Structures are given as structure tokens and as C-alpha cells.
């Protein structure tokens, strides 16, 4: 275990890989060498990082299957990202979590739509009652002669009893 996580050992293996690659591919015009070296370095680092991580996870975890599955999925997703793919591998647990989240969001939307529909129905009922109260009915001709100021229209002779009712009267009071 110490040998797996030892930094000097890892660096010496990387140096050994690089020197081996240099000796194999001595042609200076080799254009793909940096890419091959970086991919091999990443693969080696993943190999060195994943084995101790999985061993520790299996020893400390009660649900070892889920941990191993999660580690493997994470490693494959990392490799896919390095290869340039945008897709990722998902487990059934993640799909179920996403489905639950979507269903919960849909339920919340349905409740909101139900509340809004209920409010709309109440508002329509209220508007109907207001309309019924304000309903305009056709009425025959209304006599407006008592409603207008007759002082401006009639002369003194045309008033009933010959007196203008709007003139101030003199009132005497007994003491």
C-alpha cells in the first residue's frame, strides 16, 4: 500500500515511461508524441489513484457495491471527458433521483395551476354578480322637469302660483 501511494515511486515510473517513449519514438518529427505521452500519464495516474481509493472504500464502507459502482462510473466519465465526449454515464440511482425531482416539480406546478384555476373561477363568479347588479334595463322617458333648475327656463308668469320658489322669503318670528 505504501508503494502504491508513494510520490517518488509514481514520479520515477512517469520518468521511466517518458524515457521509454523517447527511446522508442526517437524520430524528432513525431507530431503525436506529446498527446500519447499525456494520455499514458493520465491513464497511469488514474490507475494509481483508483486502486488505493477502491481498496480504502471497500474496507471502510458498508455498502461496498454502491461505492465501487460510483468509483467505476466516475473513472469512465473522466475518461470520456478526456476523450472529448460530452455524454456521461449515469447510474440508475441518479436517474431515479432526477425522475423524483422532475415529478416533484410537476406536482408543484399542478398545485399552482389548480390554485390559479380556482382563483380564476372565483373571479369569473364575482364579475358575473357585478354584471348582474349593473345590468342596464331599458326605461321609458324620464320626466326631468323637476330635476333641472327651472328658474333659468321659466318666467315669473309661468311659475305655479305666480311666485318664484327660489326667491328668498321674509320670515318674521314671534318673540
UniProtKB/Swiss-Prot annotation:
Posttranslational modification: The N-glycosyl content is primarily Man(9)GlcNAc, with a small amount of Man(8)GlcNAc.
Detail which positions bind Ca(2+): 120, 123
Q: What is known of its domains?
A: Binds 1 calcium ion per tetramer.
Residues folding into a coiled coil are none
Assembly, in brief, is: Homotetramer. Interacts with the immature particle in the viroplasm. Interacts with host CAV1, early and late in infection. Interacts with host integrin ITGA1/ITGB1 heterodimer. Interacts with host integrin ITGA2/ITGB1 heterodimer. Interaction with microtubules blocks trafficking to the Golgi apparatus.
Describe its membrane topology: Single-pass type III membrane protein
GO annotation, cellular component aspect: extracellular region; host caveola; host cell rough endoplasmic reticulum membrane; membrane
| Pfam families cross-referenced by the UniProt entry | Rota_NSP4
Q: What name does UniProt use for this protein?
A: Non-structural glycoprotein 4
User: What keywords were assigned to this record?
Assistant: Activation of host autophagy by virus, Calcium, Enterotoxin, Glycoprotein, Host endoplasmic reticulum, Host membrane, Host-virus interaction, Ion channel, Ion transport, Membrane, Metal-binding, Secreted, Signal-anchor, Toxin, Transmembrane, Transmembrane helix, Transport, Viral ion channel, Virulence
Name its GO BP terms in alphabetical order.
Answer: monoatomic ion transmembrane transport; symbiont-mediated activation of host autophagy; viral process
Instruction: Report the transmembrane regions from the record.
Output: 29-51
Give the protein's biological function: Plays an essential role in the virus replication cycle by acting as a viroporin. Creates a pore in the host endoplasmic reticulum and as a consequence releases Ca(2+) in the cytoplasm of infected cell. In turn, high levels of cytoplasmic calcium trigger membrane trafficking and transport of viral ER-associated proteins to viroplasms, sites of viral genome replication and immature particle assembly. The secreted form acts as an enterotoxin that causes phospholipase C-dependent elevation of the intracellular calcium concentration in host intestinal mucosa cells. Increased concentration of intracellular calcium disrupts the cytoskeleton and the tight junctions, raising the paracellular permeability. Potentiates chloride ion secretion through a calcium ion-dependent signaling pathway, inducing age-dependent diarrhea.
Query: Which family does the record claim for this protein?
Result: Belongs to the rotavirus NSP4 family.
Q: Please, which domain of life does this record's source organism belong to?
A: Viruses
Q: Where is this protein localized, as stated in its record?
A: Host rough endoplasmic reticulum membrane; Host membrane, Host caveola; Secreted
Q: Kindly list the GO molecular function terms attached to this UniProt entry.
A: channel activity; metal ion binding; toxin activity
Lumenal side of the membrane: what ranges? 1-28
Q: Which residues lie on this side of the membrane: Cytoplasmic?
A: 52-175
InterPro entries in alphabetical order? Rotavirus_NSP4
Q: What is its main location?
A: host cell
**Protein's organism:** Rotavirus A (isolate RVA/Cow/United States/B223/1983/G10P8[11])
Residues that carry a glycan: 8, 18
Gene3D superfamilies for the chain: 1.20.5.430
